[in-house]
């Protein structure tokens, strides 16, 4: 009991029970254990963040470079297609200018006058029955003089052609003619005339053909698919021609020489270091320009100063002599001032002698003036 009492007497007043003592010791141990670990955690967190940021930057740079490479490939592919289409457009215009009036006349003459005929595979056929012999002979005479006359539904009798077929054939013939003639292209000044003539001939043919096709297309189911295909091809060819002409106009307006483009292996994404180098170079050039401007200003000021100096020196000495006493009278004493009136009036008496003349008087006056000036300066 006495030992327990002594132990109880030694306890601090703030811990009446042993349970509270244990609770206070536990957090102290935890705090002591956490104190040495806190700087390690602080050091590890920024390192992890730096690694994650570097990985994300590398991934973004790779994506950026891949996207740039793909875009440049697409641009080159589109440029090649545009050049091909532009070449085809020019050759079609030249071929239409040469063979335009004769082809239009033949196509109009070969078409029958009645609205009951339908064109199947390039041959005009009546939907209810076989075609007459006149159409056979007319088609063979006009378009195929050396061929057979008994064919109706075959692909050999090409009496009327669709616009897409005519474009393809004319482009093929034009390529042959240019390869034989040494790739001689027409001048750009003649493109406008060719465009106007070709547009007029194409509009006349396209306006006549749909009227004849649409009259009996609903009755013949086999012809609808071919007509739709021909329309789609014609529309695609027209759109391509229009796009090429617009692109040609833009190129001619912008300039004859295209902009210089680096090849793909030399194109690399810009980095922060490159940007910093560029900024430093621009800053240095700016400083050099400012220094040059200051130097030029100083030269201009120096060239203007000697011009003002001779102007000041060109003033007469009489004015300096007259202005000098006025300025000096402020700082001089009374003794240095001009002499009184009595001294001025005192002059030697004139004697009636032959030596007295005007020259002597003038010399005396000059001597008096010199003395006065000497006194005023002192």
Curated annotation (Swiss-Prot):
Keywords: Coiled coil. Residues 47-90 form a coiled coil. Residues 34-44, 165-182 have a biased composition (Polar residues). Residues 141-151 have a biased composition (Basic residues). This is Coiled-coil domain-containing protein 74A. Residues 1-52, 128-211, 301-328 are annotated as: Disordered. Residues 194-205, 314-323 have a biased composition (Basic and acidic residues). It comes from the Eukaryota. Pfam families: CCDC74_C, CCDC92.
